[in-house]
């Protein structure tokens, strides 16, 4: 869909050792207790892996539900930074690398679970986080959660979906699966799978309770960013209640996945694609 060119923030967050010393992750019980609880000045501490330091570090990001009150076609620097924090949290923690080869729940999603809890998102679902990192499928790890609230007297549901772009082991090999044509098979395959997962999540949530106005908050870095662009372009077609003005997508260091002639169902125009200075971009380049 649209690549949010915000590498300045990426450099700030992913630079190793410059933000905070490594520390132990909070216990699951403590994270759960924080759901929906405001913190002073609306700055929340989110965790991320630092490959350079070989440790899990943390950084404070501003978040408020009011970030989604304006149309997605308006660039928001604070929302871009918050998305960066969530995209980094979607990566597998450094500590989980000790169980690199194991299947199942081994802590690969601890950072993003903690981040969702702190920001008040519930009903977390994880996709492709339980594979051994020795596996090489054309998939992408994604964590999804939702937050239903009242804004301006109307019910609103924010769907948060953040794609893993680092610490994903042999899943990286999908970056090299370019395929015989100009559409990148490794990205397109992962995107089509994820579109169905997110659609199913939204439909199931809607059966539990009315969602009101649906808003999507999505982000990803590197491979995760490339796939997020494609997913976000497709979702409004399979979720008619999701309007473009409510599709908030920021990606970082996202590779190009298609040419203009490829996969029309994964294409989108770029009149809400902005550079880091807020200027409008006219193409994905």
Model-derived regions: residue spans:
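N-terminal export signals
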Residues: 5-28
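C-terminal segment of N-terminal export signals and the immediately downstream linker at the start
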Residues: 21-43
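Terminal low-complexity/disordered tails
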Residues: 42-49, 53, 63, 69, ...
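A conserved cap/lid and substrate-binding interface adjacent to the catalytic center
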Residues: 110-219, 234-251, 264, 268-278
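Gly/Ala-rich beta-loop-alpha elbow adjacent to hydrolase catalytic centers
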Residues: 220, 224, 228
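Short, hydrophobic alpha-helix immediately C-terminal to the catalytic nucleophile
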Residues: 229-233
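Active-site nucleophile loop of the alpha/beta-hydrolase fold
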Residues: 251-257
